[in-house]
């Protein structure tokens, strides 16, 4: 991670012999376009999906300083995913035990055409320590979106050959994520953090209406299935979860009844 944020640095790398430059995750689409306009001969690779670093790409040394594990050598200890308390100058606790530095995951799947038009020539999916199902689902989702763009825009040509066929419907919210954000692509925004948990939340399924006996009644946005695992944030702001043994309409019969309040999502 070389923190490639400026046209000057990209131009220097090109003149030094590099033939493709990976841009930093923190750039806006306007900044990407500016780099391409100043350095049109340089193929630019842009991050589009996966985990985000709360520091500038390649400029965080907390993991090395605290744990002796270099983030720039693929050994980040993920210090920014730990819980922290925010205390003011008088010792008053403003926030207690929240994941104040934990960012959501990047998802630019609906911005690919704009990124191509801005000058991106390839896309990068962050996948350190991800499993096979994550790789399969996420790459399939982006492959289909790119193929749809290429079908409409003949001026864009694939660098690879061959075709991909899928026997499933890729869904990005089915794979690990801390929630999604466009990050700084359209400028600074507030909704980029996942304060409650650094773990995967999955897709929103509905709201709990009531608990009675051995079942929960849910106002569902989507259907549940026997054996599903579900999670929720409890009153203390902690991530909890349980497994569903049986589903009967909007009634869920858990393996073990959780302590969950009505109106919990």
Q: What do these predicted ranges mean?
A:
Residues 2-7:
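Gly/Gly-Pro- and Ser/Thr-rich, intrinsically disordered tail segments characteristic of DNA damage-repair
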Residues 8-265:
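Surface-exposed amphipathic alpha-helical tracts and adjacent flexible/coil segments at the periphery
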């Amino acid at each position: 991670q070389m923190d490639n944020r400026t046209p000057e640095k990209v131009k220097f790398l090109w003149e030094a012999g590099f033939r493709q430059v990976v841009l930093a995750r923190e750039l806006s689409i306007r900044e990407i376009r500016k780099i391409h306009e100043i350095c049109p001969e340089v193929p630019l690779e842009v991050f589009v999906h996966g985990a985000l670093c709360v520091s500038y790409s390649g400029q965080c040394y907390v993991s090395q300083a605290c744990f002796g594990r270099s983030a720039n050598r693929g050994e980040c200890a993920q210090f920014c995913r730990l819980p922290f308390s925010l205390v003011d100058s008088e010792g008053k606790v403003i926030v207690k035990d929240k994941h104040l530095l934990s960012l959501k995951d990047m998802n630019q799947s609906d911005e690919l055409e704009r990124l191509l038009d801005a000058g991106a020539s390839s896309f990068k999916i962050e996948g350190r320590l991800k499993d096979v199902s994550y790789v399969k689902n996420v790459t399939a989702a982006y492959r289909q979106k790119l193929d749809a763009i290429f079908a409409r825009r003949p001026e864009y040509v694939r660098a690879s050959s061959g075709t991909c066929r899928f026997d499933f419907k890729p869904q990005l919210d089915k794979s690990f994520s801390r929630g999604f954000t466009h990050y700084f692509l359209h400028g600074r925004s507030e909704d980029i953090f996942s304060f409650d948990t650094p773990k995967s939340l999955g897709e929103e399924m509905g709201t709990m209406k009531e608990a009675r006996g051995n079942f929960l009644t849910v106002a569902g946005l989507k259907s549940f299935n026997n054996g599903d695992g579900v999670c929720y944030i409890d009153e203390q702001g902690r991530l909890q979860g349980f497994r569903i043994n049986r589903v009967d309409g909007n009634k869920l019969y858990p393996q073990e009844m959780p302590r969950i309040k009505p109106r919990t999502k």
